Each structure stands twice: as C-alpha cells, then as structure tokens.
C-alpha cells in the first residue's frame, strides 16, 4: 500500500517494484494464494509453484485454479490445502473481509503518495509490528502479528 493506503488504480498495481515481486515470490512459493476475481484477471494466469484460489460469485471454472464462491467456502481439508500457508492477495474487498481472520500480515509500504481507486483497510488496531523485514528508499516490507485479545 502507498502512504495514502492506495493498493490499486484501474485494476492495476500503480507501481513497479521488482524487488517486492521477488520477495513475494520467495515468500509464497509452495503455498496458497487466495484472491478475488478482479485481482486474478489483472494477473492473467495462475502463478507457478503455488495453489491459486479465486473467490468469485460469478466465475466458472478457470484452468489451473480453484474457484470458490467466498471465504466461508475455504476448507483446507476439503480443498487439498492442509499444511500450507494461505496468503490473501487482494483486492480491497477481500482484504476487508479476511483481515479479521488473519494471524499475520505481511505488508509492503510504498514510501510515496499514489493516486488510485482501491485502498487497503485499516489494520492498526488489530495488528502490531513484529518485524521490519526489508527497508529501502522506495518501500518497506513489514511483518505484523494480530494483537493478543
């Protein structure tokens, strides 16, 4: 997200950060990516060496992808996801729904204000900083954990 919480503009990510993409690939390889239909369409295909789950109320089957109607349809035992980490990959509506269910949050902060039409929801009351994983002049990647209740 940018300094003003933007995560998207016209169904695209409004920045290009190859180092962030490399980190994302390393972190998610071998695990499960859960995303909304529009996010999947912006990527265009399943990412290699990961299980891709697309949440959509309207999409039919997509080759190489598990399509489910919503978050409540995800059952790791029934969907063959047991033992894998689930990564929520957007978009804004899915982040809003999933944040209360997440134990950890890995967040890229782009160190500038960006124009856009999709925003990351507030998370600061629910999560606390666990670790700064990467910090460079353009962006920072932070790991947050859900606060104890």
Regions found by a protein language model. Give the residues of each.
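Enzymes that bind and transform nitrogen-containing heteroaromatic metabolites
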Residues: 1-149
């Amino acid at each position: 997200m940018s300094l003003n919480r933007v995560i998207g503009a016209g169904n695209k990510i409004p920045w290009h950060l190859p180092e962030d993409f490399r980190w994302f690939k390393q972190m998610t390889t071998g695990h499960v990516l859960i995303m909304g239909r529009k996010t999947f369409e912006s990527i265009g295909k399943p990412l290699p060496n990961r299980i891709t789950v697309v949440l959509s109320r309207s999409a039919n089957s997509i080759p190489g992808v598990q399509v489910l109607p919503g978050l409540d349809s995800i059952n790791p035992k029934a969907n063959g996801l047991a033992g894998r980490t689930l990564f929520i990959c957007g978009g804004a509506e899915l982040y809003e729904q999933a944040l209360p269910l997440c134990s950890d949050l890995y967040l890229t902060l782009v160190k500038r204000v960006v124009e856009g039409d999709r925003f990351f929801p507030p998370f600061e009351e629910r999560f606390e900083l666990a670790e700064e994983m990467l910090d460079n002049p353009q962006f920072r990647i932070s790991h947050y954990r859900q606060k104890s209740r």
